[in-house]
């Protein structure tokens, strides 16, 4: 039997790059890595209603630049920017470097794998039928420009006694074509019967250029959104 490799790790430095973009000297690497993990966990836990797709952390000289990709930036920014300033101060206390926050709006959450996976997880927790949730997510993604979508749900689906895995796919989803622009994400649904796992693959076309930042550029162009610097 063949084994499916992680589409993100497989394409690093080919058409996508890391979400932590910095270089550390000597023994600082472990400390900075722990800081990144704490920052991401804090943001995801503090802002669950903001529909956050990913958090990109860059560390130029004595600065921690955090870019939050979210479908609902207004939840993060708050009225007249009050909430984002509170968030910046809290993040500032978690790192020794100064913190700069950028909010990137995702205009098409239907073709963002992380948001699709989290949306299905939320529906399963609300006891929506898993087949209906999967089919609705696939059709929405294809309608907004995805060339192929595959969704897998595993666990005690529908409260069944025996756990199983169900999947649904429409279109083309190449798993081993390196030039393919495949977005992948996982999420968990904590239901009354236990934890269900959701995996989402979204194929958005092919990237012919060998450019690690190509996927980020294409996402910004597709979303037709701008970065909102706050400081």
Curated annotation (Swiss-Prot):
SUPFAM superfamilies the UniProt entry points to: Prokaryotic type KH domain (KH-domain type II) (SSF54814), Ribosomal protein S3 C-terminal domain (SSF54821)
GO biological process: translation
MF GO annotations: mRNA binding; rRNA binding; structural constituent of ribosome
Keywords: Ribonucleoprotein, Ribosomal protein, RNA-binding, rRNA-binding
CDD domains: KH-II_30S_S3
Pfam families reported for this sequence: KH_2, Ribosomal_S3_C
GO cellular component: cytosolic small ribosomal subunit
Domain KH type-2: 39-107
HAMAP family per the UniProt record, alphabetical: Ribosomal_uS3_B
Function: Binds the lower part of the 30S subunit head. Binds mRNA in the 70S ribosome, positioning it for translation.
SUBUNIT field: Part of the 30S ribosomal subunit. Forms a tight complex with proteins S10 and S14.
Similarity comment text for this entry: Belongs to the universal ribosomal protein uS3 family.
Name the record gives this protein: Small ribosomal subunit protein uS3
Organism name: Zymomonas mobilis subsp. mobilis (strain ATCC 31821 / ZM4 / CP4)
Name of the gene: rpsC
């Amino acid at each position: 039997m063949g084994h499916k490799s992680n589409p993100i790790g497989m394409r690093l430095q080919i058409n996508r790059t890391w979400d932590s973009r910095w270089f550390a000297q000597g023994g600082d690497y472990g400390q900075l890595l722990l800081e990144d993990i704490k920052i991401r966990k804090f943001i995801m836990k503090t802002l669950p209603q903001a529909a956050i797709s990913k958090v990109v952390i860059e560390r130029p000289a004595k600065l921690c630049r955090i870019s939050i990709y979210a479908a609902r930036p207004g939840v993060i920014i708050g009225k007249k920017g009050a909430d984002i300033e509170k968030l910046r101060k809290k993040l500032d206390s978690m790192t020794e470097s100064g913190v700069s926050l950028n909010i990137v709006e995702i205009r098409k959450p239907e073709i963002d794998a992380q948001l699709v996976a989290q949306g299905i997880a939320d529906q399963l927790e609300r006891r929506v039928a898993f087949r209906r949730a999967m089919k609705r997510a696939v059709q929405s993604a294809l309608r907004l420009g995805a060339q192929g979508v595959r969704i897998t749900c595993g666990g005690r689906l529908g409260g069944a006694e025996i756990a199983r895995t169900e999947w649904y796919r429409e279109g083309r989803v190449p798993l081993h074509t390196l030039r393919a622009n495949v977005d992948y994400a996982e999420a968990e649904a904590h239901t009354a019967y236990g934890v269900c796992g959701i995996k989402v693959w979204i194929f958005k076309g092919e990237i012919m250029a060998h450019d690690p930042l190509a996927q980020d550029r294409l996402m910004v162009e597709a979303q037709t959104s701008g970065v909102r610097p706050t400081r």
